[in-house]
UniProtKB/Swiss-Prot annotation:
One cellular-component annotation, GO: cytosolic large ribosomal subunit
Subunit comment: Part of the 50S ribosomal subunit. Forms a cluster with proteins L3 and L19. In the 70S ribosome, L14 and L19 interact and together make contacts with the 16S rRNA in bridges B5 and B8.
Protein's job: Binds to 23S rRNA. Forms part of two intersubunit bridges in the 70S ribosome.
Biological classification of the source: Bacteria, Pseudomonadati, Chlorobiota, Chlorobiia, Chlorobiales
One Gene Ontology term from the biological process aspect of the record: translation
Domain of life, source organism: Bacteria
PROSITE patterns in the record: RIBOSOMAL_L14
Protein name: Large ribosomal subunit protein uL14
Keyword Chaperone: no
Keyword RNA-binding appears in the UniProt entry: yes
Keywords: Ribonucleoprotein, Ribosomal protein, RNA-binding, rRNA-binding
Amino acid sequence: MIQKETNLVVADNSGAKKVRCIHVFGGTGRRYASLGDQVIVSVKAAVPGGVVKKKEVCKAVVVRCVKEQRRKDGSYIRFDENAVVLLNAQGEPRGTRIFGPVARELRDRRYMKIVSLAPEVL
């Protein structure tokens, strides 16, 4: 469960390392985001010379979440960290590589580019 002020790890090579959620998409009453949901983030730590800079505001999609999520078959999926992939205005990843596994829920949400770049889909 990702909400405002949640600190997140960036799982791509866009140049950002740590970000903080500042908005969850889905209406004014929506509080939490989970796997495959879009959020707006502020970059808190970045690599020098990277594509994104510190203090930059951008869109991101949640690819790993600590809070377990139930699947249709009754199983649960959860990860060790909250991670996002930064997106551009067209909804495509800003980086060219994805680090770590991503959830299968991204395929259902039509993030095919992220799924194809990921080393493992759980």
